[in-house]
Amino acid sequence: MTHDNKLQVEAIKRGTVIDHIPAQIGFKLLSLFKLTETDQRITIGLNLPSGEMGRKDLIKIENTFLSEDQVDQLALYAPQATVNRIDNYEVVGKSRPSLPERIDNVLVCPNSNCISHAEPVSSSFAVRKRANDIALKCKYCEKEFSHNVVLAN
């Protein structure tokens, strides 16, 4: 008996592949990073089998490349992610996110009294690594939160 090894998610000719996203996080990344605000084809694989992770999510975006800042902002959600740059169906670049000093225009402050909810300002958080956590400090209300609190918001 032979087993055919098939791609579970179709290959792309040119663009970005975000691999090794923890299961159940793929849709959150699409929404937070506004990755769907494009006319390019996006392919999503959810709960795919992974030798390393058990299950994983995967996002492929054709003709779109993430900036270094965008890649680093993934570190909060998918620290083990791999971001592959594809050209002519080949991986031409590979990077992993590293925790940035700031995250702008992505998150929402969990403090309901924060001015960022009432004024037309872009969100901005300073990122600080702690022993077993990552702290995010809002630029406007100056309150500090565990990254899990901000991500759940």
Curated annotation (Swiss-Prot):
One of its GO terms (molecular function) is zinc ion binding. The keyword Lipid biosynthesis does not apply. Heterododecamer (2C3:3R2) of six catalytic PyrB chains organized as two trimers (C3), and six regulatory PyrI chains organized as three dimers (R2). GO terms for biological process: 'de novo' pyrimidine nucleobase biosynthetic process; pyrimidine nucleotide biosynthetic process. Keywords: Metal-binding, Pyrimidine biosynthesis, Zinc. GO terms for cellular component: aspartate carbamoyltransferase complex; cytoplasm. Involved in allosteric regulation of aspartate carbamoyltransferase. Its cofactor is Zn(2+). Pfam families: PyrI, PyrI_C. The keyword Thylakoid does not apply. Zn(2+) binds at residues 109, 114, 138, 141. It comes from Escherichia coli (strain K12). This is Aspartate carbamoyltransferase regulatory chain. Binds 1 zinc ion per subunit. Belongs to the PyrI family.
